[in-house]
Amino acid sequence: MSRSSPRTGAESGGAADGSAAVSHRPAPLVVAVGFGLLGLSYVINAMDRQVFYPLLPEIRADLGFSLAQGGLLATGFTLGMAAAGVPAGYLVDRVPRKIVLLASIFLYSIGTLLTPLASGFADMAAYRLLSGFGEGVQSAALSVTVASYFYLHRSFAIGSLGAAFGLGTFLGPIVGTTVAVDFGSWRAPFVAFGCAGLAIIVLIAVGVRRHLTESVAGSRGNAELRFDHLPERPYNRNTIALAVATASTGLVFYGFLGLYPTYLRTELHYSAGQAAVATSIVGVGSAFSLLWGWLGDRVNQRTLLTVTYLGATASSLLLFNGPPTRWWQYVFAFVLGTCISGSAFTNCNSAMQRSVRPHQVGRAAGLFVASYYSAAAISGFVFAELVNVLGWRYAAFWQLSVLPLVAVAALRLVDPGKIMTSGRRR
C-alpha cells in the first residue's frame, strides 16, 4: 500500500499526530538496538564493497584481467548502485522501508556469494552489478530512515551512517586480506562477507521495529516546522546543483579508492598488508563523518562543502606529489578520506534531503545515490586510462585535484534560503 499520503500530511506540520506520536515513542533501548542493527548492516555493506580493492592484483593475476578491466570491475559495481538510485527513491516513498532494506541486503549478499564463482570478466561484472544494485537500494532506504527519524539532526544522523561506512571501510581490507591469506584464496573473503549479510537480515527482521523505519520527517511532535519555503518539486535548482557536486565526489572518491592500492603496490612497492592499511586509513577518515554531520547541522552547508572540496584538492596534490614514505601516505589518505567520504558524502546527502519537502525525501535520496554512483561507476576506468596516457601523477591531478573545484563551482548555484535548517543556524 502506498505511504505517500501520510507523508504528505506531515508536510503541513502534523500537529494532531504529533502528540500521539510522542506518547507512543519507543523506549531508548528499542531505538538503540534497532538503529544499532541498521548501522551494523551498513558496516557489512562497506566491508563487502572495500574487500575487492586490495585483492585486485591477485584477482587480475588469477583471471588475466588488464589494469583497465580491473579498474572497471573495482568501481563498476557502482553502476548497479546508480541504476538503483531513482527507482529506490520511489520505492522508499511508497513501500515499507523495512521490506526495502531486507530485500536490498539479500540482493547484495547473493551477488557477493556469486563473485568467487566467476570465471571471466563478463560473469564477474554481472555479479558485481547485482551486488551494487542491492547496496544502492539499501543506501537510499537507510539514509531516509535515519534522517526521517532524527529530522532535526539530519546531517548528524547521516553522518552516523558515514561512520558505520568508515568502520566497514577500515575493517574490510584488513579482515578480507587476512581471510584470503589464511585460506590461501582471494575467494574466501567474499564467501565470508556474503554469509554475514544473510545473517544480518535475520537480526533486522527480528530486532528492528517497524515504527523506527517508517517514521515521517516532521510528524513526531514538531508542529512548529514549516516547509512552504521549500521548492514544490523534488528536482529543483538546489538538488540539481548538489547532484553535480555529488557526481564529482563519486569520481574522486571511487577513482582514488579503486586504484590507490594498485598505485601503492606497483609504483611505490608497498606490500599487500601495507596497501591494505593505507586503504583502511581512508576508512578512518570516513568515520569522522559524525563530526562533519554535527557541523552540517550548525553551519551553512554550502560554505562547509566549499571548504571540504578545497581540502580534497590540497590533500590529493600532496598525496601524489610527496614522498613515498608510509606516514606521508597514511596522513594524506586520511585527510582525503575525511574530506570526501566524511564531509562531502554526508553533507551533500543531507542538503539534498533538506532541499525537498518531507514526502519527497525518498526521491532526493535516490537522486543522490544515482548521481554519486553513476559517476563512481566509471571512475576506476577513467583513472586507469588517464594513468596509461599521463602516468600516475598527472592522472591524479586531473581526476582527484581538479574535479573538486568543479564541485565548488556547482555549489555557487545552491540557494541556502531554500534548505530546511535544524533551527541552530542563522
Report residues per predicted region.
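Juxtamembrane intracellular "pre-TM" segments in multi-pass secondary transporters
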Residues: G18-A27, L212-A241, R426
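Extracytoplasmic gate region of multi-pass secondary transporters
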Residues: F52-Y53, R237-A287
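Helix-breaking motifs and short loop linkers at transmembrane-helix boundaries and internal kinks
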Residues: G64, P96, L117-D123, Y151, ...
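Conserved MFS/SLC helix-loop-helix module at the cytosolic interface between two early adjacent transmembrane helices
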Residues: A83-S119, R298-V299
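Cytoplasmic helix-loop-helix junction between adjacent transmembrane helices
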Residues: Y127-G166
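Helix-loop-helix hairpin linking two adjacent transmembrane segments in secondary transporters
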Residues: L161-R209
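C-terminal transmembrane helical hairpin of 12-TM major facilitator-type secondary transporters
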Residues: R302-C348
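A late C-terminal transmembrane helix in Major Facilitator Superfamily
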Residues: Q353-L390
